């Protein structure tokens, strides 16, 4: 568009084609909602514990949190129960196409998943390689095996292909990751 003073108006696209689908967290929330509605499993996203320091009260309805901080480091993103077993997992996305950087998952989260496994629960991570449009489930025992036997700072995609489990996308549930637990014999 040309304005009277000759300056061209540039329009910037607000749409990104780098992630055309929904993000991983939304896909998992939709899947978990499907599992809940159909009485398959009860799995919830854990709230992140915060302490509120400052609130702007324009009115009771329009209160806005202006300043807050995390109370404690969060453990993992999701937990629940499936077929009488406690499950706990973390979800992560990466734009990398060759590996998953280990700095994307915190040490305390890995320690938490190790404890879940030690006590008979099912722990895993779900990793989406966004540019490849591939989502993998990697059980904590396979993650521990990798960490104990490698000095790398990232997990190569080849490790996910060999030891992880691809999660196929569908309509309902969007990501049927519980099918992988069934295949493992949970």
What does each model-identified segment do?
Residues 1-2, 8-66:
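Acidic-basic catalytic patches of nuclease active cores, encompassing PD-(D/E)XK
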Residues 71-75, 82-86, 118-120:
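Short connector loops at helix/strand junctions that flank enzyme active sites
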Residues 77-97:
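Conserved catalytic cores of phosphodiester-cleaving nucleases, focusing on short active-site segments
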Residues 92-115, 119:
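Mg2+/Mn2+-dependent nuclease catalytic core
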Residues 114-144:
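Nucleic-acid nuclease catalytic cores
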């Amino acid at each position: 568009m040309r304005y009277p003073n000759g300056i061209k108006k540039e329009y910037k696209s607000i749409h990104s084609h780098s992630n055309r689908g929904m993000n991983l967290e939304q896909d998992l929330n939709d899947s978990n909602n499907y599992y809940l509605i159909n009485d398959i499993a009860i799995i919830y996203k854990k709230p992140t514990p915060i302490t509120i320091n400052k609130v702007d009260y324009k009115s009771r309805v329009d209160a806005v949190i202006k300043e807050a901080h995390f109370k404690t480091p969060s453990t993992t993103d999701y937990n629940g129960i499936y077929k009488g077993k406690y499950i706990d997992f973390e979800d992560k996305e990466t734009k990398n196409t060759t590996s998953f950087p280990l700095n994307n998952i915190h040490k305390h989260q890995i320690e938490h998943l190790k404890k879940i496994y030690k006590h008979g629960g099912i722990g895993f991570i779900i990793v989406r390689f966004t540019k490849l449009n591939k989502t993998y489930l990697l059980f904590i025992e396979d993650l521990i095996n990798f960490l104990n036997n490698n000095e790398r700072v990232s997990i190569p995609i080849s490790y996910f292909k060999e030891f992880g489990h691809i999660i196929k996308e569908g309509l309902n549930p969007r990501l049927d990751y519980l099918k992988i637990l069934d295949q493992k014999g949970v």
